[in-house]
């Protein structure tokens, strides 16, 4: 049976297992250094949970609900083994918790943001390693089924290794609460991205250029993935 366990300290042995799992499936520029996790894990607004089977971390997810923007964000989902129903388990537990967080804030969610690898991009296709469920093409199709669509912009984000590199190979996506939503006011993703990446001191010129273009727009379309 899978257990859903919250992580709040880098001293938790389960965190060391999760961090190793991240290093196995994500490229180095997407993985925050071990010691730099100490502050995020203490942040009550950041939710980091692991799926545990017989004492071993077999999956993980990080997410948040941001009342200021009335949006959710899934930072990552990791499925470490096939055949255990880990993806479904993490999804159901996360959705339940996010509904509780939104209700507690008194602000109904407009939807969820997520960065999704683009398997047609050579860099993105080679970026994620590990078990088959973590293959970019598999993940993207599953997320499409869940209702995610990509924002119409040439997306780039700052690297999480604090070196200020521009990371490509992903699309910035949104799953609207109202499935009929065809576009977003540009101020929503622009404001959210400024807030989300404020924690990283070094940002590449490519990211700043993307943000300026986004902030100059009135709206941004949601396209199929």
Enumerate the language-model features and the residues they cover.
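Short amphipathic alpha-helix that is part of the acyltransferase structural core
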Residues: 1-36, 50-52
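Terminal substrate-recognition subdomain of acyl/acetyltransferases
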Residues: 2-3, 7-10, 103-225
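A short helix-loop-beta-strand connector motif used in the catalytic cores of GNAT acetyltransferases and
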Residues: 39-50, 165-166
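Conserved beta-strand in the GNAT
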Residues: 50, 56-64, 72-78
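Active-site beta-strand termini and strand-to-loop segments that position acidic
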Residues: 52-54, 175-176
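A conserved beta-turn-beta hairpin within the catalytic core of GNAT-like acetyltransferases
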Residues: 65-74, 82, 107-110
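Conserved acetyl-CoA-binding loop-helix of GNAT-fold acetyltransferases
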Residues: 83-100, 109
């Amino acid at each position: 049976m899978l257990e859903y366990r919250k992580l709040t300290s880098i001293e938790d042995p389960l965190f060391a297992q999760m961090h190793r799992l991240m290093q196995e499936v994500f490229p180095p520029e997407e993985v925050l250094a071990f010691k730099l996790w100490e502050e995020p894990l203490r942040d009550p607004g950041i939710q980091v949970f692991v799926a545990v089977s017989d004492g071993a971390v077999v999956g993980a997810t990080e997410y948040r609900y941001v009342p200021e923007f009335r949006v959710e964000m899934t930072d990552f989902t990791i499925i470490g083994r096939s055949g255990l129903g880990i993806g479904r388990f993490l999804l159901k537990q996360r959705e339940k918790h996010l509904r509780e967080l939104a209700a507690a804030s008194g602000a109904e969610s407009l939807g969820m943001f997520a960065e999704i690898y683009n398997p047609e991009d050579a860099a993105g296709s080679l970026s994620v390693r590990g078990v088959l469920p973590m293959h970019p093409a598999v993940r993207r199709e599953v997320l499409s089924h869940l209702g995610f669509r990509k924002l119409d912009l040439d997306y780039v984000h700052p690297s999480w290794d604090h070196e200020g590199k521009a990371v490509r190979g992903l699309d910035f996506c949104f799953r609207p609460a109202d499935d009929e939503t065809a576009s977003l006011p540009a101020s929503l993703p622009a404001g959210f991205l400024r807030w989300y990446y404020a924690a990283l001191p070094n940002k590449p010129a490519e990211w700043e250029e993307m943000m300026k273009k986004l902030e100059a727009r009135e709206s941004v379309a949601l396209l199929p993935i």
